[in-house]
Structures are given as structure tokens and as C-alpha cells.
Amino acid sequence: MVSVNPRPKGFPVFDSSNMSLPSSDGFGSIPATGRTSTVSFSEDPTTKIRKPYTIKKSRENWTDQEHDKFLEALHLFDRDWKKIEAFVGSKTVVQIRSHAQKYFLKVQKSGANEHLPPPRPKRKASHPYPIKAPKNVAYTSLPSSSTLPLLEPGYLYSSDSKSLMGNQAVCASTSSSWNHESTNLPKPVIEVEEPGVSATAPLPNNRCRQEDTERVRAVTKPNNEESCEKPHRVMPNFAEVYSFIGSVFDPNTSGHLQRLKQMDPINMETVLLLMQNLSVNLTSPEFAEQRRLISSYSAKALK
């Protein structure tokens, strides 16, 4: 059991201050108060002690001649450090760039009108972030897609402003949506001053609509037939193209030139291009065996 009394009876008490240690020679004693030992446990013995930093190589100074060459090279080559290194001759690229950085900071702080080469453009990202469309953009109102006729596959309508207005005015089935959406347009401001009318006064809606319809009529009169009845084809009709090329080798078929003139321009260009490639391939030495085979067929047909 543990005794509650801090000093049990009969237990000797030792006082360290009165104790003496034997001297090194065995004749005297050294008092304990004369020797103090302090141990600091705050430092971690496992931490690695950093070695003192010593400068092994002295910093190379730039002479006035080297600095003048550096300034001249800046005017000639801007930030092409390799060419500046070759021009200076006695400094490396690392030393030149370090010197240039210090020189640029010094010029910017002093505000002197010295020549500083423009910074190099940053590399463009291979996958740039998508640019969001600005919120405050005035979109021109066009007729709804339900009022326009469906386009045939393989055709493309011209996208310039005049033909677009012509297609809208002639090909639209009804004009109700056009009149409805034209009211949402911003009111234009008068550019030419008229007597009795303010220069910044907006025009009435009826007048704007009347002028727009007159412009549409004036634009759509000459190209009504071209815009709606005869659109331009984007892709050639390969069925017609290969049918014509096959008929060229048919001895019972004639009138190839007339048929070629009646084709669409893109079909005609495709036929001519394929026939030209065919003639080049047949004249090349790689197809000598095929030519010999074709000539044997023609000889059999003549017999």
C-alpha cells in the first residue's frame, strides 16, 4: 500500500546539498553546489544541421564594353538570348538573362526612356477555355424557322445580306411573324435632319416598317428566281457523275458533250476531275497490265 505520509517514520532523508564527492586525487572533496549541469531538451537531436553556405565562385562583374555590347544587342535582337550571347561573346545565356532582368528593373524604376524589348507572347493553350458570349448583345430578329421552307439536302443558300433578305421575303409563307418580330427591333435614330423634326427623335414604327419593306422589295426583285428556285448545290451528285463516266465507255451511247453541258457546275467539275485522274492513271507504267488487258478485250470485240 502507498503511504499517505510523505515522510514515513524510520526512513532516512538524504540532502544532496550536503553531500560531497571525492576529488580526483582521493584526498579532498568538491562541494556539489560548485558544479552545475544544465541539459537543454528543447533541441531535437534528429534534426539535420544545415551546413554553412560558402560562396565558391565570385560574382562576375560586367565591364563597360560588355554592357555596351549588351545594349546594342538588345536593339538588334530584342529577347533572342542566343544571338545576344553570340554578339557579346564573353557571357553565357544565364548571365545575360540575369543581367537583363536587373537592367530592365533599373530602367523601369528610373523612368528613363531606354529601349526595352517587348515581352515574348505567351504560348496559346492547346485546349483554351470556351469564351462565353457577351450578355448585352443586340441580336437582329429574323423570321422564325417555322415560316421558312425546308432546305433540300445537299444545297446551300448564299449567306450574304442581300440574298438573305431576298430569301426571307420571297420564300416565307406568311408575313405575320415578320411584322410581329419587327416591332421588337430598336427604334432607329434619324441620321439626316429634316425641317421640324429633331435630329435625335426616333422614327415611328409604321415608317420604319414601310422603309424596310421597300428595301426588301428593291433587293429581291432581281434575284427572286436565283435565290429560291435554283439554289447552289454543295455536294456533287455522285450517282449522276459515275453514271456519266460509265456511259463514256459504252459504245452504244452518244451525245456526251451535250449531257455534260446540261449538268450542274459542281457535277461537271467532278466529272472532268475524275476523267483527268483516270487518264493520268492509265498512262502511268503501274497500270501497264491493265492497259494490256483492256486492249485484249477490244481486240476480241473487233473479231
Curated annotation (Swiss-Prot):
Probable transcription factor. The keyword Cell membrane does not apply. This is Protein REVEILLE 5. GO terms for cellular component: nucleus. Gene3D superfamilies: Homeodomain-like (1.10.10.60). Keywords: DNA-binding, Homeobox, Nucleus, Transcription, Transcription regulation. One of its GO terms (molecular function) is DNA-binding transcription factor activity. Its main location: nucleus. Residues 54-108 form the HTH myb-type domain. PANTHER family: PROTEIN REVEILLE 5 (PTHR12802:SF167), SWI/SNF COMPLEX-RELATED (PTHR12802). SUPFAM superfamilies: Homeodomain-like (SSF46689). Residues 81-104 bind DNA. Pfam families: Myb_DNA-binding (PF00249), RVE6 (PF24904). Residues 109-130 are annotated as: Disordered. It is found in: Nucleus. The keyword Metal-binding does not apply. InterPro entries: Homeodomain-like_sf, Myb_dom, Myb_dom_plants, SANT/Myb, SANT_dom.
